[in-house]
């Protein structure tokens, strides 16, 4: 893990920190867009002096995600479930923390995926590195009704700095990965349609803590919104953990607040109730 120590000395004081997951939290997958009321809430939070953090399992700089990053324009970014943390992600891109998966683990995962016909890999810039390419295409067609992948041999991934991988498939494959790779966190997506794969020891909560330290924001002034398993540690870390109304049951049961679903303006209304916008 690399940590950058050259941090900006004159950071603007913020009232508090508000963190948002992307998929099924800000982003409505039924419409393929961030809900307008959530974007308005983010805008008002910034105007009211709060630090807005996007905390996602995605690599927000790949071609499938970068437009969402630009739309949200957060003050800070926790991406790939805390394996990379940045301030000013659309400007200076100051890196606070960056974990790179070991080549040995990456090689074993690729081999396991090929031997067991499990689709896993990642997208970097305009290239897609995956085992079982046909499964990935079908996965795309099932969930976004299109696929424009630019596949390159998955072995080329060993030449890249990789922080996390994506598994495309059902519960059985996720369980096989969890059983055979105890050093991995396997975070299922909220609809059991795949999972994030990353080395244990990293989480969105760890990333938020780093950001809060830089901005000198106490945990008492933090709020986090999420919908799935990879948001659980973030919810526990924040003073107020909010589950959106369309979250999985487990997250809603544990949350401090359960908002309305995102398509019913849940994020906006909750922040208004909290007196933050």
Locations of the language-model features?
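Hydrophobic/aromatic beta-strand patches that form the interior of the parallel beta-sheet core
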Residues: 53, 78, 223-225, 242, ...
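Active-site phosphate-binding/coordination module
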Residues: 36-136
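Active-site metal-binding loops of divalent metal-dependent hydrolases
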Residues: 22, 58, 227-228
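Non-catalytic pre-domain segments flanking phosphatase-related domains
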Residues: 1-20, 217
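Short, structured coil segments at secondary-structure junctions
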Residues: 72-73, 81, 180-184, 237-238, ...
